[in-house]
Every structure is written in C-alpha cells, then in structure tokens.
Amino acid sequence: MEGRGPYRIYDPGGSTPLGEVSAAFERLVEENTRLKGKMQGIKMLGELLEESQMEASRLRQKAEELVKDSELSPPTSAPSLVSFDDLAELTGQDTKVQVHPATSTAATTTATATTGNSMEKPEPASKSPSNGASSDFEVVPTEEQNSPETGSHPTNMMDLGPPPPEDSNLKLHLQRLETTLSVCAEEPDHSQLFTHLGRMALEFNRLASKVHKNEQRTSILQTLCEQLRQENEALKAKLDKGLEQRDLAAERLREENTELKKLLMNSSCKEGLCGQPSSPKPEGAGKKGVAGQQQASVMASKVPEAGAFGAAEKKVKLLEQQRMELLEVNKQWDQHFRSMKQQYEQKITELRQKLVDLQKQVTELEAEREQKQRDFDRKLLLAKSKIEMEETDKEQLTAEAKELRQKVRYLQDQLSPLTRQREYQEKEIQRLNKALEEALSIQASPSSPPAAFGSPEGVGGHLRKQELVTQNELLKQQVKIFEEDFQRERSDRERMNEEKEELKKQVEKLQAQVTLTNAQLKTLKEEEKAKEALKQQKRKAKASGERYHMEPHPEHVCGAYPYAYPPMPAMVPHHAYKDWSQIRYPPPPVPMEHPPPHPNSRLFHLPEYTWRPPCAGIRNQSSQVMDPPPDRPAEPESADNDCDGPQ
C-alpha cells in the first residue's frame, strides 16, 4: 500500500500480523484447557487419597477387633486340642491359622496410595519416624513371610523420595511469565513484540515440561494406588478365608466336645449299670478304678495342654508385636498423609491462582482482539465508502467525457459547413476579382474618338459605360460585403479554434483525472482483496478454535479522512458562443435542422442558435453522434485518440 496512492490506512495495532496474534491466542487457550485437565486430575487424586484414608481406618478397626477377639478367646481343653489335630488329619488342611503380619497390615498396604510398591518386612527395632516429606515405610508382604520366627530382614523397596520440590521452580517460571507479559503490555515499541512472544513461548514450554513431570508423577502414584488397592482386596479375601476356617474349626471343636461328653456320659452309665449287681466292694474298687482312669486321662491331657498354651502365648505375643508395629506404621502414614495433603492443597491453591491469572490474561487478549477487529471493520467500511465515492466520481467523469466528445463532434459538424461556405466565398471573391480586373482593363483602354451627337453608336456606348459603372459600384459593394463576411468568419474560426483548444485542455485534464481515479480504484481493489484474504484466514482460524461473534457496525464511525483528495478542476460554464448571434450568413440552398446538444450537460450551456448544415450527410453524422453505442469507460489511449481526431 505504501507509495502507491494517497489512501493509506493507519493501523493502530502495530506491525504484528493478525495471524501470529491469533496463533498465540490459540496457544494460550490450549494451555488453559491443559491446566484445567491437570486440575481435574489433582482433584481426582485428592478424592483417591480420601478414599484410601477411609479404607485404612476401616481396616484398622477390623484389625483391632481381631486382636480383641484373639485376646478374649479362652484356651481350649486337651481333648478339644486332640480333636482339633484329628480334624486336621481328617480334612487334610492346616487348621493352625496363623494371623501373620500380612493380614494385620492390610490397612497399610491400601493406605499408602502415594508410595507405590514400597514393600518391606517389619523391623521393629530399626524403625525411623517419618518426617512428613518422605513417603517410604515398611509393609509386610504375604508371599515372603513363611513363619513368625524366620527373621525380619529387609527386601526390595522402591523409594519414591520426597514429593516433587518443583513448586519453587514453577513459581519462578510463573513470575518470569508475569514479568514478560507486563513488559509486553507496557512496551511502547511494537517491533519488540516478537521477542517478548518468544520469551513467553519459552516460559510456556518450561511450564509445560514441569507440568508434564507432575503428570507423570501423579500417573505413577495412581498406578501405585491401584496396585495397593488390589493388594488390599487380596488381603481382605485372605483374611475372610482365615476367619471362615477359624469359625469352621471352632464349630468342629464344639461338635467333638459334645460327642466326647456324650461318650463320657454313656461310659459312666454303662459302668454304673455293670456295677449294680456286684457287691459293694467291687463297687468301691470300680469307683477307684474310674477315678484312677480319670486322673490318668487328666495327667495325660495336661502335657499337650501345656504345649498348646505356650504356642498360644507365643501367638499372642506375636500378634501384640504386630499390633504395635501396625499402630506405629499407621501413625507414620497419618503424618505422611497430612503433610502430603497440605502440600497438595497448597499446590491446588497455587494452580487456582495461576488459572485465575491466565483467565484474566485471556480476557484481556480477547478484549484487545475484539478492539482490533472493530478497528479493522471500521477501516473496511471506510475503504468501501471511499471506493464507492471513487466509483461515483469515475461515473461522473466518464459522463462528462462523453458529453465533451459529443460536443466536439457537434462542433466538428458545425465547422464542416462553415469550411464549405468559406471555400464558396473564396471562389466567389476570385470570380469577382477577375470581373473587376476586366472592368478596370476596359476603363483603361483608349477611348475611341467621340462620335457625333445623336448617332446610335454614341448612345449605345454611353449606356454601356453607365452599366459598367453601376456594375463596378455593385461589385465594389459586394467585395466589401464579402470582405466583412470573410473577416467575421475568420474571427469566428479563430474563436472556435481557441474554444477547441480549451476543450482539448479540459478533455486532457478529465482524462488525467480518470487515469488517476482508475489507479486509485485499482489500488483500493487490491487492498480490499488482501483484506478479504486476511478475513478468510481469520475465519478458518476461528472455525478451528473458539468462535467469535462480530458486532455489526452499520454506521460510519470514523472521522474525517486525514489525507486530502486531489483537487477537482472547477467546471465553469463557457459563454463563448454569445457573440454568434451577430453573424449573418446567406441562406444555404438546403435548410435543415440539427438536433440540439445534450440538455443535462452541466459543463456547457450553448446558445440557442439555428444551425443549418447544407447537406443531408451531416444530419446522419450528427444523429450517429447524438446516439452513440454504449461503450465501456474511456481508457487514456482512447481519450487521446478522440481528442486528436478533430483537426
């Protein structure tokens, strides 16, 4: 647009193209959606942590109830233990249910949702309290603990380390981004906008990498939570199986006890019935024998009862130790969970603040984009109005040029009979000059001797002489008239030539104006095409991202145009034909009327003369001139040819 015409549109948005601004805006929108997704992930992680805490508390209550049940259960009698062993032999299963630490620490495996596969056998002697920032603690596995006496040696443990210490880095990146945005907003020089946008892109890239790392960490934690949940379900199933086996064993022991009681009652009844027919001595002997048998059976049952009691005490001690370890692990997990909860709450607040700031930036950018769009629409309306004005001016100039061409042809048609009349008058003057020369030669010839008075020859000569004198006077008067006509015709022709030159100059000026308006119209059309292409690109970008509803601007809001239009020549009506009323020509042989000039012409006001061309061909030419075929607007070359035509 620069250097091509006076119509340069001022762009208040600087030299930044609209495509790059829209691309940066789309990047900001995508970053905003990504941050929203991350916020939702963090919320889901908090919900998972709450669920794991509830599950841990529930499992803790179940473990405490199991410990209470194991403490309150009384030791069984010797025959019941013997029958318990017999039941084991009958069923072929291990009825000695050992509630090892894996069952009691099921809560810890589900509660450690943020630690992953960190599993280790309990080490009660070497327990270090958690400091709230580390997430490593021991969990008793179910696969590697075969017996409670096989030592608690450490196994594979995956330490995730402290929670991500990248909050400070994120804060620094966000502070840098805020500083770059503030500098970009306060920067008066718009040429530095690309450098600021590059810095902003670098900061966004760094933030994206940090957030990607956090996403990876959260995904790892989610997978670990899922694994721990599965382990928790497996431990629950094992615990339920152990409880069912214990209930079945207790039921079988009760049944054996009732059967033994029945057998004892039957045996005592049989002994009583057998001892009745005998004497009292054998009865006393039988009683003594029964008492001895009972004492022997009691002494025999005391030995396995003492062994079972020792095993039960060992089990109780082991369960107590596991309960203490479980309480300690639960305390550590509580501390760690609280610290993690505080950290994630702090992160959530920071991310909410960042989201609010980014939303503010997005709204500001949206407002700027709307303002630029309005300015662009105003410029388009201004350019369209200017194009319409130029087109109207061009139409007026073409109409005026057409009128001037008609005027030139009309004057040409009027000039042709005048030239013919001039030729006729010149021939007549030549003839009269010849006749005058002959008359003068006759006068200058020597006169004959005077004849006698009254002779017929003298009278005829005298009459001839008088006729020649009168004819000479008449010829002199005609010559004067012809000279006057010739002088008038010459002055009229000179005046017509001057007017013709003036008309040529006016036609040249109008042609220059037409060429200038054509060039300006061409440049404006090119600008409009470029703006239409930009609009199409913008619409495509809007279709891929968010839609923008443009406000209509029907009115012309811009002020006066700062650049001046090229000066239009003052079209003053010519009054050069007012003196033509004094010219009196002799009547031509063929009187014909000529059509008057165009009545709507605002350039010339011709006097109402009755032009009478001598021939009929002129009428045909004038009719062709007055009704020309509609042609396209005159180009500079055709206008020059029209001007050079009437010579």
Curated annotation (Swiss-Prot):
Ranges of compositional bias, category Low complexity: 102-115
Asymmetric dimethylarginine PTM sites in chain numbering: 584, 612
Short motif Nuclear localization signal, span: 537-543
Ranges annotated as biased composition (Polar residues): 143-155
Knockout mutant characteristics: Embryonic lethal. Mice develop an inflammatory disease with characteristics of human systemic lupus erythematosus (SLE), including the appearance of immature granulocytes in the peripheral blood and development of autoreactive antibodies and glomerulonephrititis.
Impact when changing residue 485 to N: Abolishes interaction with polyubiquitinated IRAK1
Acidic residues biased stretches: 637-647
Pfam families recorded: CC2-LZ
A molecular-function term among this protein's GO annotations: polyubiquitin modification-dependent protein binding
Cellular component per GO, a single term: nucleus
Phosphoserine found at: 77, 297, 416, 455, 638
Alphabetized InterPro entries for the sequence: CC2-LZ_dom (IPR032419)
Phosphotyrosine modified-residue sites: 565
Omega-N-methylarginine modifications at: 612
Protein name: TNFAIP3-interacting protein 1
